[in-house]
Amino acid sequence: MLEADHPSTKNNDIGLILGPAFIALAFHLAANGFGGYGIFRDEFYYIACSKRLAAGFVDQPPLSMFLLAASRNLFGVSQIGLRVLPAVAHALAVLLAGLIARKLGGRRTAVTLACLAVLTAPIIIGHTNIFQMNAFSHLIWALAAYLLVLIAERSRPALWLLLGAVMGLGLLNKLDFLWFGAGLAASLLLTDMRKHLATQWPYAAAATALLVFSPFIIWNASHGFAHIEFIRNATAGKYSGLTRLDFLAGQALLLNPVNMAIWLPGLYFLFFDRDGRRFRVLGIIYVIAFVILLANGHSKAEYLGPAYIMLFAAGGVAWERWAARGRRIWAVAGLAGASVLTSLLILPFAVPVLPVETFIKYSAALGVKPATAENLRLSVLPQFFADMFGWEGLAQDVSAVYRSLPAEERPTAVVFARNYGEAGALEYYAGKFPLPGVISTHNSYWFWGYPKKGVGTVIVLRGNAEDHRKSCAEVALAAVHSCRYCMPYENDLPIYVCRGLRVSLHDVWNEERSFD
């Protein structure tokens, strides 16, 4: 596959792009159809959000929730059904990497190397193996980068308007797309792309992006800028332990250390190669995003992940040209092989492809300790995997407590969950086990509120009896939920039955609001 190129082959290479894209799709469907550890904590919450569609949510813009609502109707909410669209997003990102490489001047070798890197990069394959905003960030960044390459090649008004729409969708998916916009703005000032400022089209693109994004702005303004509060609390709380060193190390580890040999030459190509310089807008976008995240001091390394697709494409071109000058195609083949092999070694840490006990042994053999980006105590699994365990058992235990209530109490009973994972999981399994309505003061659940009347018995998760007696006349420990591989704070979780509320739920809502 990695062979010397000939101009006549350029139009016959679509299979080199479609092949890896199909492999990406097939891998995710197989991994989730025949394996996996279960539905991830956040996915339960996202399902709940998708059933309460709005122009915004406390912890995310609305685009991915609308996609999930459509996905639920098409594919259901099983493990594999939830993850079809992220799998498609990965496949399309691979496809766009190949197309970008071709537009940058690459041929078969460049396309192959770019597609392989995006196919196997641990952070990309991990993000797209579950339903989350990050899965679509990779696709949207890649699509916006491709449109910029087309604009640099031949500017057309329609391309600018399409770019504006894509940028608006990027912001509606996740606010980190602001960094892409900041890099583009810098490029319009610092490069020969400034010639476009003499036309109306960059401004039309910005206006289009703002128009597409405006529903979330309006939602925030009408909800006390809840998303800003969420970002502030998360940065000061659960992400406060992250350091700049963590961020820098993650750029190597999460993308696969071998892949540095692909994306670093790609960055060089965009800034210093005679043919690559006209596309240096892509390099500037990466650098601006990198600087913003590094300056923040508490950024998760994965935040920069979507920016590497365009660097992998450029790196493929750089390697192809270097190899062609000295008939060094063997070196490119060796790099591709090393990249794939190393990614396969890292893969079990990104996607649950091994039985859990096998993974624990594999991790120990490599000397890798469980990790988290948040200030939390860990189990024998990294947080990403641990948060896939224990949810059905929790629903069973709460259901048993609910069924133990006298028949006359059940119609007015509710469950008070302390975080969105617990609340979302209980709602998810309500179709399988008898469960009452669920309320919570965490993130968007706070806005979704509580029954305004008719609340009697409250089943409360967490806390201690002494504190609960301040709010309830009668408190009884009804059960303790245990789970083997879950996060420690979800293990040995007390489940209380509280009767005779001493305070109104209105007061509880004002005191217990938690946006983080």
What are these regions (language model features)?
Residues 52, 114-115, 147, 159-174, ...:
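Membrane-interface alpha helices of multi-pass inner-membrane proteins
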Residues 84-105, 143, 147:
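Transmembrane-helix motifs of polytopic, lipid-linked glycan transferases
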Residues 320-362:
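Signature aromatic-anchored transmembrane alpha helix within multi-pass, membrane-resident enzymes
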Residues 169, 178-279, 297, 347-352:
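Transmembrane-lumen/periplasm boundary regions of multi-pass, lipid-linked membrane glycan transferases
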Residues 8-9, 102, 144-160, 194, ...:
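Membrane-interface transmembrane helices that cradle and orient dolichyl/undecaprenyl
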Residues 4, 15-18, 22, 97-120, ...:
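Transmembrane-helix signature of polytopic, membrane-embedded enzymes
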Residues 123, 129-137:
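Short acidic/glycine- and proline-prone juxtamembrane loop motifs at membrane-interface regions
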Residues 96, 117, 136-154, 159-167, ...:
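Specific aromatic-rich, kink-prone transmembrane helix
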